[in-house]
Amino acid sequence: MSTVSSDPAHAKKSRNSRKALKQKNEIVESSPVSDKGKETKSFEKDLMEMQAMLEKMKIEKEKTEDLLKEKDEILRKKEVEQEKLKTELKKLQKMKEFKPNMTFAFSQSLAQTEEEKKGKKKKKDCAETKRPSTPYILWCKDNWNEVKKQNPEADFKETSNILGAKWKGISAEEKKPYEEKYQADKEAYLQVITKEKREREAMKLLDDEQKQKTAMELLDQYLHFVQEAEHDNKKKAKKIKDPLKPKQPISAYLIYANERRAALKGENKSVIEVAKMAGEEWKNLSEEKKAPYDQMAKKNKEIYLQEMEGYKRTKEEEAMSQKKEEEEFMKLHKQEALQLLKKKEKTDNIIKKTKETAKNKKKNENVDPNKPKKPTSSYFLFCKDARKSVLEEHPGINNSTVTAHISLKWMELGEEEKQVYNSKAAELMEAYKKEVEEYNKTKTSS
């Protein structure tokens, strides 16, 4: 009995357990549905990302298309410009050659620079062109060995320090011979170097100015040439005839034709008919009738030859005078260049002096105003006299050209004429020396 009663209970338990299993199975079956939801969400996300990427690609494509269009437009414009240039080049090739009517100093300046470069190498070897040693260095050369004997263990720096200390303790009388030697060496050095250097710098300044002027002149000439070429339009440029040149004499036939032209024109005939009739008449004319016309032509030829001789002489004289003018012009230009350099040197000296005055202000304050001033030189005395005449000869010129003209006049002045100014300068110098002596006496007595 117990076995029977236990079976249904066991069966119920087993059923309950089956139901529980079904519930588990339901839970297991419900999990794939949730996974599908997640998958759809991720797919939508991917789709959105893909759409965004496509939009970006579309925008980039549009941008690249725009860039390509711009590049195509630039290329098209360049092609149009090239075509224009080709046509302009063809026009220029057809045009006559541009020949500037001016002389250029570029080749000359280049040659000068080449010579200067060669000259520099030679000058380096010369002892005269070496910079003079200062009084201190000259003294060091004389006393180096003595200091070395006294201090054999001292190196270069220590030796130079000892010499520097000794130099400071030396009196002015002991320094004087070294200073005098330095001044003499300096004068010799400046005589060798200064003239060439100053002229070179002056010519460089002038060369820069001339380059600017020639560039402007060249531009004006080229613009004028282009206008003429456009105006001519493939026609050959007519030669400019000299109005002063004698005209060639006409032949005996032309003299006869000119006489007959008036009579034949009165018959209401054309120019060609008149020329034909005059030619036939001249052919049929006898030698006796032709003779007076031949004599007239011969006389005209003789007059023409005489006039041509005179014309050639005047042309030669003009060429000679032009050559002289060019030489004078070159001299004047050189003087102008030197004046420019002097101005530059003056400005440099002013800058130096301002620096020196700042240092030596105390010394300058103690300078006596009653001390006699040095007299002007013979050249400056000449300048005072020549300035008026130069301004009268060349009105409206600037100061630099005035000084250039004056310096040229001084250079061309004879020794006798220069002696007048030299003697005046000497008199002024003697008077100055006397004034200095008197000034020194009064200073010592006070």
Swiss-Prot record:
Residues 129-197, 246-312, 372-440 bind DNA. InterPro entries: HMG_box_dom, HMG_box_dom_sf, HMGB6/HMGB13. CDD domains: HMG-box_AtHMGB6-like_rpt1, HMG-box_AtHMGB6-like_rpt2, HMG-box_AtHMGB6-like_rpt3. It comes from the Eukaryota. Residues 11-22 have a biased composition (Basic residues). Residues 349-371 have a biased composition (Basic and acidic residues). Pfam families: HMG_box. GO terms for molecular function: DNA binding; DNA-binding transcription factor activity. Residues 1-43, 110-130, 349-377 are annotated as: Disordered. PROSITE patterns: HMG_BOX_2. It is found in: Nucleus. One of its GO terms (cellular component) is nucleus. Keywords: DNA-binding, Nucleus, Repeat. Its main location: nucleus. Belongs to the HMGB family. PANTHER family: HIGH MOBILITY GROUP B PROTEIN 13. This is High mobility group B protein 13.
